[in-house]
Amino acid sequence: MTVKKETPMMEQYLSIKKRYPDTILFYRMGDFYEMFLDDALKAAPVLEIALTSRNKTQEDPIPMCGVPHRAADVYIAKLIESGLKVAVCEQMEDPRSAQGIVKREVVRVITPGMILNEDLLDKKSNNFLAALCICQGAAGLACMDISTGMFRTTQTVAVNGKVPLSLVDEALRIDAKELLLPASFKGDPTYSQLIKAFETIQISYVGNENFKLDSARERLKEKFRTRSLEGFGCEDLTAGTAAAGAILSYVQETQLRETDHVLTLERYELNTYLIIDDRSCRNLELLKNIQTSDKKGSLISVLDCTITAMGGRLLKAWIRYPLISMDGIEARLDAVAEAKENPGIRNSLRTHLKDVYDLERLGSKISMGHANPRDLTALKISLYKLPLLFKDLNQLSASLLQGHGIEDREKVSTELFELADLINQTIREDAPLALNEGGIICDGYSPELDEILEIARNGRSWIAKTGAKEKEKTGLSSLKIKFNKVFGYFIEVSKIQSQQVPDHYIRKQTLVNAERFITDELKEVESKVLNAQERRSSLEYALFCKVRESIVQRTPSIFKIAQFLAEVDVVLALATTAEENNYTRPALNKDQVLDIEDGRHPVVEKMVVGERYIPNSIRLDNTSDQVQIITGPNMAGKSTVLRQVALISLMAQMGSFVPAARADLCIIDRIFTRVGALDNLSLGQSTFMVEMEETANIVNNAKENSLVILDEIGRGTSTFDGMSIAWAVAEYLHDLDGKGVKTLFATHYHELTRLEKLKPRVKNFNIAVKEFNDNIIFLRRLVPGGTNKSYGIQVARLAGVPDAVITKAKQILASIEQSPDQVVTQDKKQVKKQTKNNHSARSGSRQQQMDLFAGHDYDEIIKVLDQTDISTMTPIDALNLIHELKQKIRSKAMI
């Protein structure tokens, strides 16, 4: 939309808008942020506010809408949630003193990945901006949470010039809110599948020059004031460095100020953590319930009793990034064990942590210049708790609880306590949120401010005192101090005494009965009185900035303490959860044995109502019990058993105690899951396609130290196709690289139980069921051996299927079991008649089949069939044989 005739204000607006074309421009006008033209048309329906216009009487009036500046955050949040970006344009001078149009500038751009306001953020989740690129044969991923200062990067080998699946999974694992991609990716068919994988993330395309390696390195070195990136372990990093440089460029463009709170760039490797891809995270319900997408019903809902926001974020990271280092895991378990064994100290620490605010986000806001007086007060309260926290921690010995990452803990504690004292001496407890209203600085801190405050509070009495002093000094009984809007404050003396005024009095006005004068001293007093509020606000802001700068200088120490307290918080939370839920410390082994005695599903056991949770034992190893085929009816609990094994392994490697009587566990490097049945119809993917994609991912990437959880693969296609696929996958995982992989395979294909006799490391188990009077009771107990019954009709009855349907199902089942080819109808006479017809049809069919073979030499085929021992064949072997015979028949029929 264009404007035919531009006013000076609209010229300014359009000039600024031109620099930020992909944003909604919040243009400050007095007490409102206004939006014009296309921005107004986009924003009004999202914000649910009235759309109006400027110059309504003219042709083509300009669409506009506005929101109060005090409520801007609420409206900005709505725009961000709808996928829009917001450029905040402020008035840079007082409109009262401006000559011409008020000077305005964009002070920051808010995007989904660039949010500092805690009201717009999930307190216990990071808010990552990520960047992905390909450079010199490598694929790199970097991410930054500007609200906490976290900045990380990694890279891996590109596959045929493309981003590998492992890096796509990593971008999903960090749950980025915004992803930067090179502009050249947009519209390029090569990257269409990659972009499709990130449909839940807002993608921002930026110029390819932002990803250039050389400029990225220079940008990072300048940012961290270093000569090289060697100290960050990034000197040999190509794509990872390019991605990090692109993020830094984007941050500088949107925030328009330095990010001093981003103190380091951390390089990490994907293979140093237990990998759980995004699908497995969903299937295991680590962070969200798969049905409701809520936190309730997930693993984190059970484990998260952290006190602080930063502790909550770290716990989430521990769940998504379990360790594979035995030493690292044991260090966490040692800390949890000690905290669990000392409930008095643990409870005292947790009580003190209730007064600790989000130090990471407070530090970031202060460093970025977005903090208000109440943020400083929150920091003060938090820092005052350090001595009490350290006093309790000194009674414990676990290395994780001693803050060894802080070089001199006592010195840092003392420095930060002194910083808290400074805040206490300067910032009022009842200070307002706004920085321009005064009322921020404590009385007694600044003599100059105290004088201004005295004048502001008692201006009239101060003027009266000045008048009394002048009257006494001059001896003029008629002397008075008065005020009007023309002259301000002035001295008035009667006509008779006007000849006796001191020489330094300056005549200002002559009246019939009096003369009016001013003095330099009076004008100075007047200036102080009339400008007291403005001077007060200005001085208080300057003093506030000085205190803020003192805090910024201590930002590294604040962040170290924040990270340490977050770790303490997580340890205390895991200890509390372990005690409340009767968890036990897992033992770790190097023997590739996964042995769980009386294991429980941590979430399901909390949700069971009206019945006792039945624990189950599982043992997996690489010698005899590597692949377990688990059969049993629906609703019996197969899926729960499968998931609990994966969750117990994950919990142990994140450093948590586990829900089991005993757990002796090997280190798992990756967990794969194929569980659940959520169709992705919106992408045109059926249940079967989703299953096959997940299965393909597993068979292509599983290794010796992985754990594979398979639940009902092969559905959504014909029975024999599904069974064949399930069988082949089970065999493949058993034979993988000649070593196999630990696998739990729940299935309704009872034919798979034959694998136990064919493969040395396959074992059969089933979920026990008790039958009585044509009903079943689920015992929920995993027992050795297979089963050949699915109890589908009984489960249907439990689900509330009408009796008429159940009765009919039994008839059909009996008929099928007796004669699979028989067609069952409503009428028994029809059944007999149909059966007779079927026999006749089969006889005719056999004759036709004999005629088909007539005239051709099929002796070879008949000989193969005669010599084949069907009882020793697997379904895969049988299908292969049938395929070969069909090819031979076709070739002979064409002769």
UniProtKB/Swiss-Prot annotation:
Keyword annotations: ATP-binding, DNA damage, DNA repair, DNA-binding, Nucleotide-binding
Gene3D superfamilies (UniProt xref): 1.10.1420.10, DNA repair protein MutS, domain I, MutS, connector domain, P-loop containing nucleotide triphosphate hydrolases
Family annotation (SUPFAM superfamilies): DNA repair protein MutS, domain I (SSF55271), DNA repair protein MutS, domain II (SSF53150), DNA repair protein MutS, domain III (SSF48334), P-loop containing nucleoside triphosphate hydrolases (SSF52540)
Biological processes, Gene Ontology terms: mismatch repair
Presence of keyword DNA damage: yes
Ligand binding (ATP): G632, P633, N634, M635, A636, G637, K638, S639
Annotated Polar residues bias: 837-849
SMART domains found in the cross-reference section: MUTSac, MUTSd
PROSITE patterns in the record: DNA_MISMATCH_REPAIR_2
Any one GO MF annotation of this record: mismatched DNA binding
Annotated stretches, region: Disordered: 824-849
InterPro entries to which the protein is assigned, alphabetical: DNA_mismatch_repair_MutS, DNA_mismatch_repair_MutS-lik_N, DNA_mismatch_repair_MutS/MSH, DNA_mismatch_repair_MutS_C, DNA_mismatch_repair_MutS_clamp, DNA_mismatch_repair_MutS_core, DNA_mismatch_repair_MutS_N, DNA_mismatch_repair_MutS_sf
GO CC annotation: cytosol
Record function comment: This protein is involved in the repair of mismatches in DNA. It is possible that it carries out the mismatch recognition step. This protein has a weak ATPase activity.
Assigned protein family: Belongs to the DNA mismatch repair MutS family.
Protein name listed in UniProt: DNA mismatch repair protein MutS
Native source organism of the sequence: Desulforapulum autotrophicum (strain ATCC 43914 / DSM 3382 / VKM B-1955 / HRM2) (Desulfobacterium autotrophicum)
Gene (UniProt): mutS
